[in-house]
């Protein structure tokens, strides 16, 4: 049997699939051939299968380095449920429990061993690794090794030395969902990958509907509550920037009768574990979390992710939003933002980064990098281009024809023309072009009048003729620009100022109190032929339901993902009824075995089951996601439910 045949056989036996997803086969065969690999694949594309198949086919243990221990138990449970012996070593175990795992791994009884990168630095683990055959090392979330990435973790810097120190170096696989070209180079260099086979699959997630809503902070909680109320049977994640907002929003949802749990780094380990358990077992449908929840979830049926605040980077947003729809089913990702979010993010960025492993100069380099990452995120909020295209271009790829929509619409080179992806709010909106030359020039002159010494709030007040007490020291009435824009809406002035900063006419000096200064293109605003426009969504969108209009009253429409746009299969009433019965059975089995429902079967597998309606072993194995081990464990109970349903329908 060739390596290719063996890999396909293992894929079918353990995972219930008869073919690999794009990119998987090449990575699997490279690792089986003893070659290092770097796999950059979107969340939900099956990165873990790329090292789990080689682990199943290799004689020794595969060491999986993963950043969050909160995820390990679920990963290990899922693998054991597939018939792949797996275990973890982390701080939740007693010394005796760890000793048992070490002994099992040394005896060849464990195929995959999960550890955090900090574990590699302990003498006990290094001794274990020196005397235990390790056939493969898989580094998950490999972007954490790079200071240029959005989630740098200094503990990852020791992985390369650990690998070098092994008596016999095994092939190494590094995997991530988010990595620009610069981050990829860091991963290869810092982990010491040797001539790796690099696989970068498309970054687009066509089953996700991307939505951007500009909304004042005071309206955000109502927007979220309305969305959750309209989707009572769906699992969702709501990300917030601070612990305080996280707890307040979770309390608000609960008070309104929408069960939700909070999750953030300030909670005790037991409280975080309980919150995560309630969410992944479907006991509570919604988790409101800070980014501490970012890599700690492996739940396949999350139907929506809402960002209550602006994320720190496109990488962070892509990864967090990517928690939705991991099973390939249509899901929605909504970003709520406003100008205050940008100011808050910049302040957090400047005040929140310290690392004892780095010199002050290196820390400043990291800060500058993170400022550039934030600029990319702000650009995502303001673009009028296709949001799928913006995302893929950011990662260095062009959106191909048919990408961004599984319905198969062709996307033109410019989404403002005929091509619309059908899976983002920009492509479902009509934008109007507004001439704001006078506003832009007035702003630029006012920045000059105040000597580049104040923030955007004071600039706006002066231009609109405010005599507020906090302006007295500036004596604004003597300035030529005082009251120059008193006829312009305050929100419009703020909007133009912010857009000018994005376009380089202005810059925002970083610090505790951000100051508006001239940007690299400032001189252009004084030119006789200077012309400046902004694009804003019209109140009536091209397709009803765009969240771009930003009003709470629009929430009911904006909550609906167009099924035809996402190419989703629409089941008939019988299939939907059977699907719900299969979900109930899955929940019952999950409670009996004490595991999350998605570990039994994913929603996608249950959908396929409801469509095929298998009543024999052969038919059951034909369902996507059903392998022999799952058939042995659960097949009879599911087929009995299907047979009973068929009998009832026939009568």
Name every feature range the model reports, one short phrase each.
Residues 1-7, 90, 343-344, 349, ...:
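Accessory DNA-binding and partner-docking regions appended to nucleic-acid-acting proteins
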Residues 243, 348-350, 357-404, 408-409, ...:
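Cys/His-rich Zn2+-binding cysteine-cluster or related metal-binding knuckle/ribbon modules and their
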Residues 12, 32, 254, 392-396, ...:
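Amphipathic, well-packed alpha-helical segments that form the structural scaffold of globular domains
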Residues 168, 232, 384, 452, ...:
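Flexible coil/turn residues that form the inter-helical turn or adjacent wing/linker of helix-turn-helix
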